[in-house]
């Protein structure tokens, strides 16, 4: 791990009571998934770049290291390398896929281009249970994705598993606490992958499973109190789970010194504005300012069809409305002899990773609160910035938030405006809102609302489709049904919904939603498509 310029990863600077497991990222699509799986074993984890110097890694006092997979071959020009000093530091290490190979190469094993690649589900034969496979079946399905293979383990290692095409599918040196697997234990297709990770963390590395929701809540409350003291705070509620959980957590820490501003832009799904005003306040007791600005946003969006322009307009208006509310609240606070000094932000750990934010992170643009004037600059309070989405949901449950808020599916900041392909008008909003309500109701009735990452309706407002309804020829709008499964929204697959469910959704939409005479199902994955249409 050299001193070359490296990718910017945001350091969370949090949880000093935990010695983290550091996931060293070699450019893997699964790096975040590995970190999440570690946390599912109740062990705290963070992601760092592959070229972080060894001294900097060790300064973080890691309990263990996991070397991720990556898209390169170890023989590619400029391929990431590992400083062998890392393996002499006495820290337990697990190499996964590319990490397995780069460990072997650094410690004088052999990595070869065998000409036989493995992709997808593969049968693994356990030849020696060792630490990783102790108590597990001798034959199990694993998920492979590699071209090169380790053909000889480094000196001092013993081979513990193989496949028909990979003679060294796993190895270990328990004396030095070094382990490697060619497969991906973090993906669900590896049948006993979580057991392998758990064995490494709890047995091989001796980590303590102390990363629990109760501890997270207690620690976050303490941290917020220490940061803000007696200061006053403001939070922009979007109606989504992130801002709701952030506000609820801060409310528990500081009570009535927090005021939440809910900017209702008129672009939410059916019943959401009422739910925020009723259920969120009832469950938290938070001081809520509900700004009803639907007419203002509708006027600003009139005649606009370009999706980027929609986003910019909505972001601009959101900032202006929030700014006006913040000024009013700050003036009221000053009249009482206080001042609003803090802004609560629902930043999550993936945002920190992707933005490379330092500890004082910038406001997320998709939360539509960025770009506030100089005289309204607040110190940021980001109580969720070390958490993944699934952890935020569990935290919301721990805080007693209503299930409908905690398990609300991801929703774009511009709301239904980007689910109308064409100009946004009040009439079209009612159409897509009604269609979306039918879709979500049927998915909920089918018991699939937690299995599907996102499901929604899109209105093709600039398209007219010919149809026959009541023996009359019609020209109505087509509605697109979009349903995807995903782990983290970085990639997504279209959901294989049952035909009878698709039929019920289609029948209800064309019969209950005016001006719609056709429903189509989008079967595009991400990539090449995106989850949203705009």
UniProtKB/Swiss-Prot annotation:
Residues 211-408 form the GMPS ATP-PPase domain. Residues 20-210 form the Glutamine amidotransferase type-1 domain. InterPro entries: Class_I_gatase-like (IPR029062), GATASE (IPR017926), GMP_synth_C (IPR001674), GMP_synth_GATase (IPR004739), GMP_synthase (IPR022955), GMPS_ATP_PPase_dom (IPR025777), NAD/GMP_synthase (IPR022310), Rossmann-like_a/b/a_fold (IPR014729). Its EC number is 6.3.5.2. One of its GO terms (molecular function) is GMP synthase activity. The active site is at 97 (nucleophile), 184, 186. It catalyses: XMP + L-glutamine + ATP + H2O = GMP + L-glutamate + AMP + diphosphate + 2 H(+). Gene3D superfamilies: 3.30.300.10, 3.40.50.880, HUPs (3.40.50.620). One of its GO terms (cellular component) is cytosol. Keywords: ATP-binding, Glutamine amidotransferase, GMP biosynthesis, Ligase, Nucleotide-binding, Purine biosynthesis. The keyword ATP-binding applies. ATP binds at residues 238-244. It holds the Pfam family NAD_synthase. Pathway: Purine metabolism; GMP biosynthesis; GMP from XMP (L-Gln route): step 1/1. It comes from the Bacteria. Homodimer. Catalyzes the synthesis of GMP from XMP. PANTHER family: GMP SYNTHASE [GLUTAMINE-HYDROLYZING] (PTHR11922:SF2), GMP SYNTHASE-RELATED (PTHR11922). HAMAP family: GMP_synthase (MF_00344). This is GMP synthase [glutamine-hydrolyzing]. The gene is guaA.
């Amino acid at each position: 791990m050299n001193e070359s310029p490296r990718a910017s990863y945001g350091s969370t600077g949090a949880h000093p009571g935990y010695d983290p497991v550091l996931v060293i990222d070699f450019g893997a699509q699964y790096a975040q998934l590995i970190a999440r799986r570690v946390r599912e074993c109740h062990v705290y984890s963070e992601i760092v770049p592959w070229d972080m110097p060894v001294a900097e890694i060790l300064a973080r006092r890691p309990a263990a290291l996991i070397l991720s997979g990556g898209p390169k071959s170890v023989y590619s020009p400029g391929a990431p390398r590992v400083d062998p000093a890392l393996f002499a530091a006495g820290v337990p290490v697990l190499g996964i896929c590319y990490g397995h190979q780069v460990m072997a190469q650094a410690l004088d094993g052999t990595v070869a281009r065998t000409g036989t690649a493995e992709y997808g589900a593969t049968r693994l034969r356990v030849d020696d249970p060792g630490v990783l496979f102790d108590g597990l079946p001798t034959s199990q399905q694993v998920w492979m994705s590699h071209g090169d293979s380790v053909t000889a383990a480094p000196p001092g290692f013993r081979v513990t598993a193989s496949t028909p095409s990979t003679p060294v599918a796993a190895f270990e040196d328990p004396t030095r606490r070094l382990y490697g697997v060619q497969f991906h234990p973090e993906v669900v297709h590896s049948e006993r992958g979580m057991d392998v990770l758990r064995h490494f963390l709890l047995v091989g590395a001796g980590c303590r499973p102390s990363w629990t929701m109760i501890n997270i809540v207690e620690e976050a409350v303490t941290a917020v109190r220490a940061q803000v003291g007696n200061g006053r705070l403001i939070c922009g509620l979007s109606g989504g789970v992130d801002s709701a959980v952030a506000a609820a957590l801060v409310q528990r820490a500081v009570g009535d010194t927090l005021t939440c501003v809910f900017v209702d832009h008129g672009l939410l799904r059916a019943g959401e504005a009422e739910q925020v005003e009723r259920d969120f306040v009832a469950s938290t007791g938070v001081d809520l300012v509900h700004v009803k600005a639907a007419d203002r946003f509708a006027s600003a969006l009139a005649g606009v069809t370009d999706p980027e322009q929609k986003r910019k307009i909505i972001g601009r208006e959101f900032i202006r409305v929030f700014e006006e509310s913040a000024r009013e609240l700050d003036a009221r606070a000053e009249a009482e002899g206080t001042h609003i000094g803090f802004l609560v932000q629902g930043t999550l750990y993936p945002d920190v990773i992707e933005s490379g934010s330092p500890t004082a992170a910038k406001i997320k643009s998709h939360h539509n609160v960025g770009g506030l004037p100089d005289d309204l600059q607040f110190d940021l309070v980001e109580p969720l910035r070390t958490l993944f989405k699934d952890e935020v949901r569990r935290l919301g449950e721990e805080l007693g938030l209503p299930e409908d808020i905690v398990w609300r599916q991801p929703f774009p900041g511009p709301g239904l405006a980007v689910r109308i392909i064409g100009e946004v008008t009040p009439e079209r909003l009612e159409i897509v809102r009604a269609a979306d309500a039918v879709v979500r109701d049927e998915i909920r009735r089918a018991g699939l609302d937690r299995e599907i990452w996102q499901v929604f309706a899109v209105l093709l407002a600039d398209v007219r489709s010919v149809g026959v309804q009541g023996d009359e020829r019609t020209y109505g709008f087509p509605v697109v049904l979009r349903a995807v499964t995903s782990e983290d929204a970085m990639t997504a697959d279209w959901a294989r919904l049952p035909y009878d469910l698709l039929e019920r959704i289609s029948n209800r939409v064309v019969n209950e939603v005016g001006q719609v005479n056709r429903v189509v199902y989008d079967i595009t994955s991400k990539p090449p498509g995106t989850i949203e249409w705009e």
